[in-house]
Amino acid sequence: MVNQTHSKMHISKVNEVYLNLEVDSALGQELTDYFTFDVPGAKFMPMYKKRIWDGKIRLYSQKTGKIYCGLLPYIKKFCSKNSVEYILEEGIEDDRNLIREDVRKFTESLRPKSKGKKLDIRDYQTNAILHSLRKHRSLIISPTASGKSLIIYALVRYYNLLLKDKKILILVPTTSLVEQMYSDFIDYGWSDKYVHRIYSGHERTTDKPVVVSTWQSLYKLPKKYFEDFGCIIGDEAHLFKARSLTNILTKLENCKYRHGFTGTLDGTQTHRLILEGLFGSVEKVVSTKDLIDTNTLAKLTVKCVVLKHPQEECKKVKGSKYAEEIDYLVDNSSRNKFICRLCDNLSGNTLVLFQLVEKHGKVLYDMMKDFDRKVFFVYGGTDTETRENIRAITEKERSAIIVASYGTFSTGINIRNLHNIVFSSPSKSRIRVLQSIGRGLRTSSTKNSTVVFDIADDLSHGHWTNFT
């Protein structure tokens, strides 16, 4: 509890990244404790093991007084909880006074279309656009197939009119998503003369007002490069590496308009607060359940297939570490044959997700490539154009199999005509699992349901149980 004799705070704005909290040392220590969090899994990290780092992240610096602008609601909550009087400098809160109907009319005026057909703007999309434009900063939770790209498109078109001499930067985690965002904008009806793409092999400088780039292409660039941008939009924000995301967004010191988009947060407070601090407060526009109930998304069935391994094998694996257990599973020929038979017997298009390329993905592909159906292999080394071609071909197929790494196909890739998803490798990432399921939730003219096959393994022996 804050000492009542030290209960005043002056909040000023340093730039579009940081606020400054002017407090005495006692209150500063309370703030430090309040905004300090344990990093999940820190004990496994080299810096922690070497005792160079204590495994905590501190979002408030008592030394500088700085804290991310997006954490203002949490600062107010701290003050309210601890009876701290605060003075907020004028201009820090400057919500734009917008009317919902005006936002709806603006979005309608863009006349967005897909494959030549007019797109209807859903109410929750209008709400998301309104919230973002009013607040200037936001973190929009928008699940798969909720029309997130259209929300981003409307924001980009609005800021393109508003920011006469500034550009708009859209950051995505993969080259495939650069191409997908670009093609979506063109599909909606915009000209390519407005949009520039950046990833390996593309120029980083352009006169075009909108730049779509992977964060990997930009995070090492100097602060001066980012001076031209007045708006930053981060798509699939949950996948940005914390240090790289922080690196880019803290260089955008004069970038007022900041919007992050994600379908999933990882459930940890640290993850959420970093994203909210760099972008803005969380706003959930619609739930996956709502979209399924209204038939916007496909009906979902999850089938957990538990493979009981022979006791003599279980005895060999008993006491193994997680990585050793994974090595055993991906190298297990009986298990791999079962996965291949399962995929061959499924009707419709099937996505098989794996974790280890050489040890597992390549093995599964080699076992399936002679099936009497089209089988594709996608991993990190597959170039962007090939991935796009595979995606396009699969949309027209009825019985294709894509053997793909989690990293390339678990997030953001749109394949409407996907009937089955098979998890051939275990994954400990909550985000990865949820995003992977999202790949199959889009509907198409040939599909209104999706089945997810989660392959689990029972290697228990005596009182010992395995990880997976």
Where are each of the predicted segments found?
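Conserved pre-motif I regulatory segment
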Residues: 89-141
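Walker A/P-loop
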Residues: 135-157
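Conserved helix-turn-beta segment of the N-terminal RecA-like "Helicase ATP-binding" lobe
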Residues: 168, 175-199, 372
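Conserved helicase ATPase core of P-loop NTP-dependent helicases/translocases
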Residues: 179, 194-206, 351, 362-363, ...
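Conserved helix/coil segment N-terminal to the catalytic DExD/H
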Residues: 200-231, 241-247, 408
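Post-DEXD/H (motif II) to motif III coupling segment of the RecA-like Helicase ATP-binding lobe
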Residues: 230, 238-303
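Conserved RecA-like P-loop NTPase helicase motor core
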Residues: 264, 379-468
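Conserved interdomain hinge at the start of the Helicase C-terminal
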Residues: 317-355, 359-367
